[in-house]
Amino acid sequence: MKKFLCMMMAVLMVLAMAACAAKTTDTPAPAETDNKTDAVQETATEAAADGKTELNIGVLVWKYSDTYGSSVRVAMDKYAKEIGAEKGLTINLEMQDGNDDQATQNNQADVMFAAGKDHIIINLCDTSAGQYLVDLAKQYNVPISFYNKEPVDSTIVTGSNSIFVGTKPEEAGIMQGEILADLYAADPSRVDKNGDGKVATLEFEGEINNPEAIARTEYSLSTAIEKGVPCEMMTENQVANWDTAKAQEMMTAQIASLGVENIEVVFCNNDDMAIGVIAALNEVGYNLGDGGDEIIVIGVDCTDTAVEYINAGKLYGTVKQDGDAMGKANILMAINGALGKDWLDGTDYTMADDGFSIRIPYAKITAE
């Protein structure tokens, strides 16, 4: 009897232990304390740690109608697909046109940041207005990159999780000056048409307070003079806002004021303005590409239209700003930013001496 009772007790103990084990296994673990309810959405770094394979990247563009900017947009779309495929990532790009209005761009930014983008690429409408976007980036803990139009205050880049993709502001101007100096050295009479020992010069500037525009304007003139071209400014800089129609209008006014025969060289901060200048010259029989009267016009960007004009003998030269290379750099920076990696990880770029930018080199383009 005692043996029977002992056996029964042993069986009951085993059953009890099994029941406890079953209860422990079947009961869900207590939910984690929801301390993240009020926190910012998961950062890109955390997403990468979770093995994220899809990135949502926003792109804020200053205006779609800008010719060079369009080449950068096309390149970004191309490289988002190509590089994404190479890295096993699906990259969803959402682009917005700021239409050259900073208030519009700020509103677009509000929506993009609130939507939880992994990274936002920014081409400022107003180069003095970057602080608002940096503040949004900090609020939402989202990395950003500026491109092409450098913020006037570089401290907003250095003091945030951001980088600038652009060019050396002075380099394009230096190359414009060199293009003119090379022509002057080879054929002075083609530049100084009236032989008075002075080269009557106009400057068409992109916009006020834009570091790129300021440097292109300053260095094109100073480089030409340093290399022996006796340039003499005819008027104050013509600020045409990078726009073809505005440049044509302003050049028409200068022709009426100065007389086309008294203008010998026109430097333009971009090719769109150069095309506008040439349109105004065409109206008075200059730069038709027929071997007749011409004024030396030099632009920047090397757009497709500019190349056509160079080949046709209407535009003397331009400085290539590589839109394809800039678009590629934008995508590589966005991927690294979104994945919480070092900006230069897996790239061939080097950080500029300023510590907050990578710079795409320029190249001189003429028909010679």
Regions found by a protein language model. Name each.
Residues A49, T53, G195-I208, E212, ...:
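Hinge/cleft segment of the Venus flytrap/periplasmic-binding protein
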Residues D50, Q105, F164-D196, A245-M251, ...:
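Hydrophobic alpha-helical segments within soluble ligand-binding/sensing domains
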Residues D110, A114, I120-Q139, I144, ...:
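Hydrophobic alpha-helical
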Residues L133-E171, S189-K198, T303-N311, L315:
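Flexible loop/hinge segments that line or gate small-molecule binding clefts
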Residues N56-A75, Y79, I83, E94-N106, ...:
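Extracytoplasmic "Venus flytrap"
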